[in-house]
Amino acid sequence: MFNLFLIDTVWYVGQIIFIVAVCLMVTIIVVAFLASIKLCIQLCGLCNTLLLSPSIYVYNRSKQLYKYYNEEVRPPPLEVDDIIIQTL
């Protein structure tokens, strides 16, 4: 009888250890999945910082320079008579 009780106790302890191990594995897998999602979000933010923001800045700055060149730096267009005189 004592031997049977010891086997039952070992069985229950083994079941508890198995349940704890399964819970730990599930917890590790869930934490790894959430960490990978967080990493993806951080990489998207990094992509925004390194690629999107500078390209928007370059686009806006080049548009400003284009307007500045057309309004202030570029000489006025020549009339047809002036072109003929310059070619002669």
Swiss-Prot record:
GO terms for biological process: disruption of cellular anatomical structure in another organism; viral budding from Golgi membrane. It comes from the Viruses. GO terms for cellular component: host cell Golgi membrane; membrane. It is a single-pass type III membrane protein. Its main location: host cell. The keyword S-adenosyl-L-methionine does not apply. The lineage of its organism: Viruses, Riboviria, Orthornavirae, Pisuviricota, Pisoniviricetes. Homopentamer. Interacts with membrane protein M in the budding compartment of the host cell, which is located between endoplasmic reticulum and the Golgi complex. Interacts with Nucleoprotein. The gene is E. Belongs to the betacoronaviruses E protein family. Residues 38-79 are intravirion. This is Envelope small membrane protein. Keywords: Apoptosis, Host Golgi apparatus, Host membrane, Membrane, Transmembrane, Transmembrane helix. Residues 1-16 are virion surface.
